[in-house]
């Protein structure tokens, strides 16, 4: 399927003042209600990464799980789950980070990766970059390396993709929105 940014953007709903005043939330649930848009999204990532040299896909809680798991399945790669604090049952490593809403903690199972593994980290969007930077730190603490950070949406005005690139992490997104774009 040929990528069509207009179709993709038309399936991402802008929700003003959610979860707090002044924030425009980018709701991707309509994308999942459109089989065409979902297939285009997954296929676009699969085409980009089909011949790439990485060993695992790491998906961010919770919306990163949705596309990350589909791409991991299509590429036959192991899926590593990065969860919000207190959601994983076994031994974990944790990393504090700042979001656009406040401080949070990201966790991963301590046995998820091995020395030398290479991880494509996935989230639904790149805003401040805090979640993906925390995931990258956890990947490195486990002895692995970050291949790239990928997302459906980039919000470049919030600086996350720049922060990731400044930390030596390549980024890729299917589309970008200006903060005031509806």
From Swiss-Prot:
- Stated name of the protein: Adenine phosphoribosyltransferase
* GO MF annotations in UniProt: adenine phosphoribosyltransferase activity
Q: Where is the signal peptide?
A: none
Source lineage: Bacteria, Pseudomonadati, Pseudomonadota, Gammaproteobacteria, Pseudomonadales
Domain of life assignment: Bacteria
For this entry, list what GO says about its biological process: adenine salvage; AMP salvage; purine ribonucleoside salvage
What job does the chain carry out? Catalyzes a salvage reaction resulting in the formation of AMP, that is energically less costly than de novo synthesis.
- What InterPro entries does the annotation carry? Ade_phspho_trans, Adenine_PRTase, PRibTrfase_dom, PRTase-like
């Amino acid at each position: 399927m040929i990528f069509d940014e207009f179709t993709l953007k038309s399936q991402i709903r802008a929700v003003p003042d959610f979860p707090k005043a002044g924030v425009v939330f980018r709701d991707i649930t309509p994308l999942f209600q459109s089989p065409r848009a979902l297939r285009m999204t997954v296929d676009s990532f699969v085409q980009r990464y089909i011949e790439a040299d990485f060993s695992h896909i790491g998906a961010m809680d919770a919306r990163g799980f949705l596309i990350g798991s589909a791409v991991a399945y299509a590429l036959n790669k192991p899926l590593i789950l990065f969860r919000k604090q207190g959601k994983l049952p076994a031994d974990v490593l944790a990393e504090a980070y700042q979001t656009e809403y406040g401080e949070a903690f990201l966790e991963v199972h301590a046995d998820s990766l091995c020395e030398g593994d290479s991880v494509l980290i996935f989230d639904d969007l790149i805003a401040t970059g805090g979640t993906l930077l925390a995931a990258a730190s956890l990947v490195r603490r486990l002895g692995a390396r970050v291949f790239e950070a990928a997302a459906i949406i980039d919000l470049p005005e919030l600086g996350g993709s720049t922060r990731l690139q400044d930390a030596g992490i390549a980024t890729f997104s299917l589309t970008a929105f200006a903060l005031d774009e509806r």
